[in-house]
Design a protein with these regions (language model features):
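Helicase P-loop NTPase motor core of nucleic-acid translocases
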Residues: 1, 126-127, 382-388, 416-420, ...
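Amphipathic alpha-helical interface elements
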Residues: 1-113
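Short amphipathic alpha-helical face segments that pack within enzyme cores
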Residues: 31-35, 249, 253, 395-403
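Short boundary/loop segments of OB/S1/cold-shock single-stranded nucleic-acid-binding domains
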Residues: 112-139
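Charged, glycine-rich intrinsically disordered N-terminal tails and low-complexity linkers that flank
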Residues: 130-140, 161, 167-288
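Conserved ASCE P-loop ATPase motor domains encompassing nucleic-acid-directed helicases/translocases
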Residues: 134-198, 526-585
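Mg2+/Mn2+-dependent nuclease catalytic core
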Residues: 153-185, 333-448
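A non-catalytic, helix-rich entry segment at domain boundaries
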Residues: 257-340, 508, 515, 521-525, ...
Length: 585
């Protein structure tokens, strides 16, 4: 069958055959369903000029683009998972999956389901198994004690019970928080998210340890390496000297170029970005070792060219481009609503970060990467995710997505997320990815582990952890391939070997200094005494009256003027009216 000329009629016929041919092996039937789904997705996304992480993200994208109902979308993704398996399906499951596939084909091709197929499939969805009934989105609590099944807590809400029990495991709803056994301490604060409360038992989908201790999202993502993600990797990365390489300078340029392209309204000049970027980063350019100016300019021009194409795809500025996007069923994003590098704090998840590009209506979220992606260059998918995106970049994007969800109370299908590898043309580099809940939870679990480790070291002293900073301990995945031994392990040893060659006096000094730094960092994040105005968590923990008394906030401000410092830039200067803030402010 010619994939380039596939029709809905042919795909419907394949569905009819997988339901009616009597001699098909179960695994052959599943593969036939899977191949039909692939053909349908190929037809749906072939003109989008975007790359897709895997079949999961293609299905997710097309369901959003075609306005498929949430219940049907769940059924379609269930069918996709079943088709990936060689396990035989029951006759009932096969019919429900065939129904989901038929609905998907109908939506993608915008054609009615033929009668001869319609009579073979159920007219309603598979009975939905009701999951956890969420009746409280967020509960702050303090740990009293715990056992293998429950954490006993005092909650920071009006409540009838003096003590609540937080369930650690619920197999029916695929909830497992038992990794917390090794992290919990009496007096530890927790955020319980997406909870079912049946007094006195709380069953949360997500638990965040010491949420006032904000961790930078990019720092978490960097720790997802080919050799695993040990909690001490976070501290190891903090010990590394700040990188100043041609690659980091190119990444900074690419971010500036995206900003200029968005705000240039079709009149972009790459040389202007090069000049302004050099003015802002003159010291870094001058001190960058082995800097190759000619190669930098060539690479920068390629990045800018690719970014211009990406912006035209995401924000069509001509009627013909907009019409083509609408014809493909894609969401249209408003360039006027685009904002670059907005910063967020998320007390719910205990993380903070700066998004590369999003729209103010939260319909679009883009994370940009300027470096190489060998999966794209070799056309080999990551076996863990069957996709081309790199794991740390996927983690970073999912955490930003989680911030938007929890800060703005957004549903799962509200935000469209993209990974942008700007070294490559949009058909390879502008990658549509889907929300992967398992990896998101793994990232939050890792965040909890590194926070607990930081608290423990700050309390007990760095000397108790010093001997754990070795490649053998940090390599939790047991990786021993050529790339690890040739490149990654020597990078680790550059930091860890000097730690084990210290004299007793040097070791005592270094451990005392690290303990002091970690304690100061902890105080700056969570504070040492309430009301002293010393920590970043005062932003959400300090009452308004105390903020006013401390001169920590202006209220009732109004924007009276906005200005551009130069043509082609966004509005970067605003004038505010400041009413009287009260006596002794």
């Amino acid at each position: 069958m010619n994939q380039n000329n596939i029709s809905a009629t042919e795909l419907f016929q394949r569905v009819r055959e997988l339901l009616t041919l009597p001699d098909l092996e179960p695994k052959t039937r599943n593969k036939m369903m899977h191949d039909t789904l692939i053909l349908c997705c190929h037809e749906g996304v072939k003109d989008t000029k975007q790359a897709f992480g895997n079949l999961f993200s293609q299905v997710d994208y097309l369901c959003k683009a075609r306005g498929i109902k949430v219940a049907d979308k769940i059924a379609i993704q269930t069918m996709r998972r079943h088709s990936n398996s060689q396990e035989p399906l029951s006759g009932e499951d096969l019919k429900y999956d065939a129904r989901a596939l038929t609905l998907f084909i109908s939506a993608v091709f915008e054609e009615r389901i033929p009668h001869e197929v319609n009579v073979l499939i159920p007219h309603i969805n598979r009975p939905f198994q009701k999951g956890l009934e969420i009746n409280n989105r967020r509960i702050r609590c303090i740990v009293k004690n715990w056992d293998s099944d429950f954490i006993r807590v005092d909650i920071d809400q009006d409540a009838d019970e003096e003590e609540y029990l937080v369930r650690l495991k619920d197999e029916e709803n695929h909830i497992d928080h038992t990794y917390l056994w090794d992290l919990l301490k009496e007096g530890m604060q927790l955020n319980l998210l997406d909870c079912q409360v049946k007094q006195p038992i709380i069953t949360p989908r997500l638990i965040v340890v010491e949420p006032d201790y904000l961790v930078d999202i990019s720092s978490i993502a960097t720790c997802f390496t080919a050799f695993g993600h040990h909690p001490l990797l976070y501290l190891l990365n903090l010990m590394k000297p700040r990188a100043n390489t041609q690659a980091t300078l190119l990444g900074n340029f690419a971010g500036a170029a995206l900003d200029d392209i968005i705000n240039s309204h079709g009149k972009y000049q790459v040389n202007e970005t090069v000049k302004s970027n050099f003015r802002e980063k003159a010291l870094e350019f001058c001190t960058c070792p082995w800097f190759d100016a000619k190669k930098f300019y060539t690479d920068a021009s390629l990045q800018a060219f690719n970014l211009q194409q990406v912006v035209d795809i995401l924000f069509p500025h001509t009627a013909s481009q907009a019409k083509m996007s609408a014809f493909r069923g894609e969401s249209l994003y408003d360039r006027k609503k685009a904002i670059l590098e907005p910063s967020f704090v998320c007390e719910a998840l205990g993380i903070q970060g700066r998004v590369d590009l999003m729209t103010t209506d939260c319909k679009l979220l883009v994370e940009q990467k300027s470096g190489r992606n060998m999966n794209i260059e070799t056309h080999q998918v990551d076996p863990a995710y069957h996709s081309y995106q790199l794991e740390p970049h996927y983690v970073q994007l999912l955490l930003y997505y989680g911030v938007l969800q929890h800060n703005f109370k957004l549903s799962n299908d509200r935000v469209n997320i993209r990974l942008l590898y700007s070294k490559y043309q949009p058909q390879d580099g502008l990658m549509v990815v889907a929300y992967y809940q398992k990896l998101f939870k793994e990232a939050i679990e890792y965040r909890n582990q590194l926070v607990a480790a930081s608290f423990e070291i700050a309390k007990e002293g760095f000397e108790h952890t010093l001997n754990e900073f070795t490649p053998e301990v940090l390599n939790v995945a047991g990786t021993q391939d050529f790339f690890y031994n040739k490149y990654l392990k020597p990078q680790i040893e550059t930091i860890t070997n000097p730690l084990h060659d210290l004299s007793p006096l040097e070791e005592a000094y270094f451990c005392r200094m690290m303990t002091f730094v970690l304690r100061e960092q902890m105080i700056s994040k969570v504070g040492a005494q309430e009301g002293t105005n010393t920590s970043s968590s005062d932003l959400w923990t300090m009452p308004l009256t105390e903020k006013k008394d401390a001169g920590n906030i202006y209220t009732d401000l109004h924007i009276i003027r906005k200005e551009q410092s130069c043509a082609g830039s966004g509005y970067d200067t605003i004038t505010l009216s400041v009413p009287d803030q009260g006596k002794d402010f």
